[in-house]
Amino acid sequence: EIWKHFDADENGYIEGKFMQKYDKNSDQHVGSSAEFMEAWRDMSRLLPVQENFLLKFQGMKLTSEEFNAIFTFYDKNEPAILEMNIQQLWNY
């Protein structure tokens, strides 16, 4: 659902438009790199595990199918639950 919300043109990619939409939705101005990273961190606290996992790949262009394949690879035991927490993923 979040993917569809930020993939406005439905091309299967979340691009720079993501933060523009976040900016509009949150009434915050995201200008500098530091503000951008702070906005990413704020957003990650609001998202469930699968969407939070997307942060690991923030510089890549992934289709929803590619993202789901990567998530499924790391989701070994239960659907939509990762064993490693996000901090461990950042350090991986």
Swiss-Prot record:
Keyword vocabulary terms for this entry: Calcium
Annotated InterPro entries: Calbindin_Ca-bind (IPR051001), EF-hand-dom_pair (IPR011992), EF_hand_dom (IPR002048)
Domain of life: Eukaryota
Domain EF-hand: 18-29
Organs and tissues of expression: Brain.
Record-linked PANTHER family: CALBINDIN (PTHR19972), CALRETININ (PTHR19972:SF4)
Protein name in UniProt: Protein 10
Organism (species): Cavia porcellus
